[in-house]
């Protein structure tokens, strides 16, 4: 049975769409050379070129971290922490992206309105990844409970072995007398 489109929950992969919005914004901004005036384009050509490459590199790294984190379905706590580290790296790279936009805006003296969409979308992406990371806490709780149950089973199996060994030892000493 299908759910009517209006009643569907928003996809948990919202950050994927957000990322491509951020990426398109970055490419658009770079293709317009950060909306700098002609004199500033000449004066700050080195900065524009350098920050353009850096912003594209950061966007590629964000995508890579999101994809790697999404490919890990944790079956153990170590996998949960690996997934979380990838999410944390993606968030850190989003902040690096924001920092690069701020550097360009301050040095080239751009009006705030020029990069506001880029900054809002990057901030929205950060919040989406944080929400994704928060929703993953159920994995941690389940994996801790599983580890606790496994430890109890292991302890009870070990106790049974010790008990069996001691009872066999007791039989051996009574047989010798």
Where are these regions (language model features)?
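Amphipathic alpha-helical assembly/interaction segments
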Residues: 1-177
């Amino acid at each position: 049975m299908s759910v009517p489109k209006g009643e569907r929950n928003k996809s948990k992969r919202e950050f994927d769409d957000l990322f491509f919005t951020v990426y398109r914004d970055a490419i658009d901004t770079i293709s317009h050379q950060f909306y700098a005036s002609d004199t500033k384009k000449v004066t700050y050509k080195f900065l524009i070129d350098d920050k353009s490459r850096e912003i594209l590199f950061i966007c590629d790294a964000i995508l890579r971290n999101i994809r790697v984190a999404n490919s890990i379905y944790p079956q153990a706590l170590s996998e949960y922490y690996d997934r979380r580290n990838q999410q944390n790296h993606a968030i850190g790279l989003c902040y690096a992206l924001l920092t690069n936009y701020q550097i360009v805006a301050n040095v080239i003296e751009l009006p705030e309105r020029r990069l506001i969409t880029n900054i809002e979308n990057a901030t929205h992406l950060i919040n989406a990844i944080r929400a994704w990371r928060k929703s993953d806490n159920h994995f941690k709780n389940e994996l801790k409970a599983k580890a606790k149950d496994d430890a109890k089973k292991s302890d009870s199996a070990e106790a049974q072995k010790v008990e069996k060994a001691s009872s066999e030892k007791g039989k051996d000493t009574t047989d010798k007398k």
